[in-house]
A protein has these predicted regions:
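C-terminal ends and interior cores of transmembrane alpha-helices
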Residues: 104-109, 113, 133-156, 160
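Helix-loop boundary and gating motifs at the non-cytosolic
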Residues: 21-112, 312
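Conserved glycine-rich helix-kink/hinge and helix-boundary motifs of the Major Facilitator Superfamily
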Residues: 55, 99-102, 134, 214-217, ...
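Intracellular loop-helix junctions on the cytosolic face of multi-pass helical membrane proteins
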Residues: 1-50, 148, 158, 172-312
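A generic transmembrane-helix signature of 12-TM secondary carrier transporters
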Residues: 137-144, 162-163, 266-274
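Small-residue-rich segments within alpha-helical transmembrane domains of MFS-like 12-TM solute carriers
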Residues: 62, 66, 167-175, 232
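Membrane-lumen (extracellular) interface motif
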Residues: 67, 74-91, 95, 124, ...
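Helix-to-loop junctions at the C-terminal end of transmembrane segments
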Residues: 108, 112-128
Length: 312
């Protein structure tokens, strides 16, 4: 996707060569030979430990913290603060618990739309994605540990804020983590060999694209399997933590137990994310053909104009 620079200053380093996948004209008699869509740099070759570091981050970012236990803790505080009348004063008037939760979700998603419009394109373009993932992860860790101080009903408003920010942090970290796997797949030794075969005319472009797709699917599916197995062990430890805190003894113990579980799962996430932060190779992303921020809005506009052409 190429376009004239709209006049905004570039916000990322130079990305990949936009001529990839074309036809190179040879010096002798106009001879043509295919150019592999992925030009390899030995510095960016994907290693086994880097792939496992990628999987490890997903084990940590399993959703137990800000997507499962945090919503439960938040709604617990709402019900306890509301009492028998089941209403609380929020956003200018008394509202039911369901209304408050729905409004909180709406606020969270509205902010996510804005965030993804502004920085979403950095997941695919330029070289900023790893740094953005680190920053967003730190925000998520801070929210997770902050729940240790929010476990009584009078702090339900603080819980509301943590709930909203936590949802945003979880979704954005997951998005920027997911965006790394095409680069991992296309820099594996297997895909490098396929690119050489394609450049030599041994395989067709369709065969190369099929190998690329299969490698990406392999990394994505294995990541899900590894994450699921790892989550089982985390949940087993969590059961022990619940008994240790004696969550069934009282409402206060149950509230405290949820906060402890959120913090524990956050600690696991933090530890498992460090290898990925250290071992990820800063590969260049795609070339947006324009300022990276503008590229996000351009993609939205293009989707809105092209969606009507989809077959029903």
């Amino acid at each position: 996707m190429a376009s004239a620079d709209p006049g905004l200053a570039p916000l990322g380093a130079a990305a990949e060569d936009p001529t990839k996948g074309g036809i190179e004209i040879g010096a002798r008699g106009g001879e043509e030979r295919p150019v592999a869509p992925d030009q390899f740099d030995a510095r960016f070759e994907t290693g086994r430990w880097e792939i496992w570091a990628y999987y490890a981050y997903y084990i940590g970012n399993n959703g137990l913290t800000l997507f499962n236990f945090a919503p439960t803790a938040f709604q617990n505080l709402l019900y306890q603060a509301a009492g028998d009348n089941m209403t609380l004063y929020f956003a200018g008037r008394d509202r039911t618990i369901n209304s408050i939760v729905l409004l909180a979700n709406g606020i969270s998603f509205a902010i996510q739309i804005f965030v993804f419009l502004v920085i979403g394109s950095f997941a695919d373009f330029g070289t900023w994605r790893p740094n953005i993932l680190i920053v967003l992860s730190v925000v998520a860790f801070a929210v997770g540990f902050a729940w240790l101080g929010v476990h009584t009903e009078e702090k339900w408003r603080v819980g509301l804020g943590l709930y909203i920010v936590g949802l945003i942090a979880y979704q954005t970290t997951l998005t920027f983590w997911t965006a790394a796997f095409p680069g991992l797949a296309r820099n594996t030794p297997e895909l490098r060999a396929k690119a050489d075969e394609y450049s030599q005319g041994a395989i067709t472009r369709d065969e190369y694209d099929f190998a690329d797709s299969m490698k990406r699917n392999e990394l994505s599916n294995v990541a899900f399997i590894v994450q699921s197995v790892g989550e089982i062990f985390i949940l087993a430890i969590i059961v022990g933590v619940m008994f240790g805190v004696d969550v069934n003894a009282s409402v206060a113990n149950n509230n405290w137990g949820l906060s402890v579980l959120i913090a524990f799962a956050t600690g696991v996430w933090l530890l498992l994310s460090i290898p990925w932060f250290v071992m990820e190779k800063r590969r260049p992303g795609q070339d947006p053909g324009m300022n990276i921020i503008a590229a996000g809005f351009w993609q939205l506009w293009r989707a809105m104009t092209q969606i009507w052409r989809l077959k029903q």
